[in-house]
A protein has these predicted regions:
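Bacterial N-terminal signal peptides that target proteins for export
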Residues: 2-12
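Hydrophobic alpha-helical segments with strong N-terminal bias
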Residues: 6, 106, 438-439
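Exposed boundary/loop context
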Residues: 6, 86, 119, 189, ...
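Bacterial N-terminal signal peptides
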Residues: 11-20
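Acidic, metal/ion-coordinating pockets
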Residues: 27-327, 376-383, 396, 469, ...
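Catalytic centers of hydrolytic enzymes
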Residues: 28-39, 44-48, 53-75, 117, ...
Length: 681
């Protein structure tokens, strides 16, 4: 009997072991993997940088340049080749705008053609895709389609105008399915739903998208997720979001619209982010949803490995691959880049007597843009002021001299890096101020404009830096030329500028009379984008910073196109002066110090010139000097509140004091009565 029982137990154990092994194998068979390769904010960076002259795509270890789309191609192709059936390549938007290559986007669509050749499968639209307006974006897409297939373009929260026809060409491409809200990909037996959204912050800095608008990305995501769950029956949900992530003020935690999506729509399994140019070495985990971003400009390629089992999607691991001189360029892709470089020369630069790889200047130091005084900011703003005067200043009429010029940090897109040789090409200089489209000629590049302001309005313009920038960030920091000013961050918002000095024609500075009695007009200059913002800044500051650009007679300018600098007033219409052309012209006129026929960057730009001075003080003189009604009104309100508080305290205290006095008198009376009775006894 014991022998039989022992044999029976052994047989049961063997059967259970086989069952467990079989279940384990089945579980492993059910677990599937998916690799998501991602980039974002490539911004037409097809060459390694910077400087471009030192980019050596086919040799390793001999330059310090980073990026380069042909290097990106090498990495992505190698990763896809390992397991193409389990790999999905996604970009988080802003594949356009930032280099000379985007100037031929409407004819050649180099960026989309290259991304298709590399193997990208899905791309969302960023704010810079709309820099050439909806009609221009339609031209870019049609140009790409005329030359072959393109990746899936995804935009779920775009809203077209029902009354304005200027977005009809783009809407037609949506109706054809060239751009769509989402796409289903099948990889490794998995149904993967990918959709794209534009963040509200990105939409805010896409003024040329009008009349296109954008719906709330979170509400859009909830709607798409329902479709994925109920109709499409997907296994994995990926959101390509051009929303962004930023460090909180504590510099420890994160915030941003990409994080909001993961938190508010937990059904999303992965957020492939963009817009904020944030390099995340590791994903930000929000309720088990990885939020990704790979810096910008092709500096990194991100690789996320997922494991999917029984409906659960989990991150297995993540890797960031740096794109630098340790990666050899893909020869096919580099050949395409070379072809597009020649197209840029033929179509855009030769009319200006330029070439993309032409050495244009040399520098013995780096020029960088900062959220502070910066030598590059000084250079760019000086170039604006100088260039406007080349076309409009007549010494016989002193009021035609440009007194101040301003530029936004958001318009300055790259540093000027000395590198090993110090030689700067046309392409390096273009990358500094590459953005925009003509208001009249519809050609790439923002145009310069000039107008007149009163002294108090100049102060209001500088208050954008002191008061709007702390609330809105990098894009609202201003670089200035022709002026110096001090500000006190402890003063009342919108009235923090203490005083301003402006330079005369000889470069000598003197205080600017900021009183309302000063009726003189001062000529100012900027690009049309910044000018539009200056005109509108009063609207979103409650009227506190209302600025009215005027002509030389003091008449308000209704249409800013009439304020554009005209390169040839004798020709019909307005011949726009592009900022990028003006910038090159300014540099072209620098002295050739060493006699090699190349202009040298002046030593005066080695360091920032300290045009903006922050003075933290609670001294009354620095709190009230040149104060406006904003400060006096706030001070009066505070005084009224203090007096009211004193009155309230006294009002409450009076009956209490009366009660206290009455109690004291009563106590004294009681003591006297007790004392008298004690004596009698």
């Amino acid at each position: 009997m014991l022998r039989f029982l022992r044999g029976f137990l052994i047989r049961v154990g063997i059967i259970l072991a086989f069952v467990l092994i079989d279940k384990s194998s089945l579980a492993q068979d059910n677990a599937k993997t998916l690799t998501i390769i991602h980039t974002n904010d490539l911004q037409s960076r097809l060459l390694g940088f910077a400087p471009n002259r030192e980019y050596t795509p086919f040799t390793l270890g001999d330059d310090q340049t980073i990026g380069g789309i042909a290097r990106v191609a090498t990495v992505i192709k190698a990763l896809k080749q390992k397991s193409p059936e389990t790999t999905l390549v996604i970009d988080g938007g802003d594949f356009l705008m930032g280099t000379l290559f985007h100037t031929i986007a409407r004819e050649e669509s180099a960026e989309l053609r290259l991304l298709h050749e590399i193997g990208y499968e899905a791309i969302t639209l960023g704010n810079h895709e709309f820099d050439f307006r909806p009609r221009g974006l339609a031209q870019i897409l049609n140009a790409a389609l005329s030359k072959g297939d393109i990746p899936a373009l995804l935009a779920a929260n775009i809203v077209f105008s029902e009354s304005d026809t200027s977005d009809d060409a783009l809407q037609a491409l949506f109706k054809r399915g060239v751009v769509k809200p989402y796409q289903i990909f099948v990889k490794n037996g998995l149904r993967i739903g990918v959709f794209g959204v534009m963040g509200m912050n990105a939409a805010e800095v896409a003024p040329f998208a009008a009349p296109v608008t954008f719906a709330n990305p979170v509400e859009t995501a909830k709607r798409i997720v329902k479709i994925f769950k109920n109709d499409e029956r997907v296994d994995v949900i990926v959101c390509a979001s051009h929303g962004g992530v930023w460090r909180k003020s504590d510099q420890k935690n994160w915030e941003g619209e990409d994080i909001d999506l993961a938190r508010e729509v937990p059904e999303i399994d992965v957020v492939v982010g963009g817009h904020s140019h944030t390099f995340l070495k590791e994903p930000i985990m929000v309720n088990n949803t990885p939020v990704l971003q790979a810096g910008a400009e092709g500096r990194y390629v991100g690789v996320l490995n997922l494991e999917i089992e029984n409906g659960d999607v989990a991150m297995k691991d993540y890797q960031s691959i740096a794109i630098n001189d340790s990666v050899a360029a893909d020869r096919h892709i580099q050949a395409m880049v070379d072809h597009y470089q020649e197209m840029v020369n033929q179509k855009k630069l030769r009319p200006h007597g330029l070439a993309l790889d032409q050495v244009f200047a040399e520098t013995q130091f780096d020029l960088t843009i900062k959220e502070d005084n910066s030598n590059l900011g000084d250079l760019v703003s000086d170039a604006i002021r100088w260039s406007i005067d080349q076309y409009e200043y007549n010494p016989a009429f002193p009021n035609t001299r440009t007194v101040i010029a301003v530029e936004s940090n958001g318009m300055i897109r790259d540093d000027l890096v000395m590198g090993k040789s110090g030689l700067l090409q046309v392409s390096d200089l273009f990358r500094v101020v590459p953005l925009g489209i003509g208001m009249v000629d519809d050609q790439p590049g923002f145009a310069l404009m000039s107008f007149y302001l009163t002294a108090p309005e100049i102060k209001k313009a500088f208050e954008v830096l002191t008061s709007v920038h702390p609330l809105k960030g990098w894009d609202y920091f201003l670089q200035i030329s022709g002026a110096k000013f001090r500000y006190n961050p402890n003063r009342v918002i919108f009235d923090r500028v203490i005083d301003i000095e402006i330079a005369d024609a000889g470069g000598n500075f003197a205080p600017l009379d900021l009183s309302s009695s000063n009726k003189q007009l001062y000529k100012a200059g900027c690009n049309i984008f910044v000018g539009t913002f200056i005109k509108l800044v009063g609207d979103f500051t409650g009227g506190f910073l209302r600025i009215v650009p005027k002509d030389s007679s003091g008449k308000p300018i209704e249409n800013l196109n009439t304020a554009l600098v005209d390169a040839n007033p004798n020709a019909a219409g307005i011949q726009e002066v592009k900022q990028w052309v003006a910038f090159l012209d300014y540099v072209r006129n620098f002295e050739d110090v060493n006699g090699n026929n190349i202009p040298d960057m002046p030593a005066g730009y080695r360091f920032p010139q300290g045009r903006i001075v922050r003075v933290d003080s609670w001294r009354a003189a620095l709190l009230y000097k040149n104060a406006t009604a904003v400060t006096w009104g706030a001070s009066g309100l505070i005084l009224v509140l203090l007096l009211g508080l004193v009155w309230l305290v006294r009002l409450v205290a009076r009956p209490l004091m009366k009660n206290a006095v009455a109690s004291k008198m009563k106590a004294r009376t009681s003591i006297k009565t007790w004392a008298s009775s004690s004596v009698l006894r």
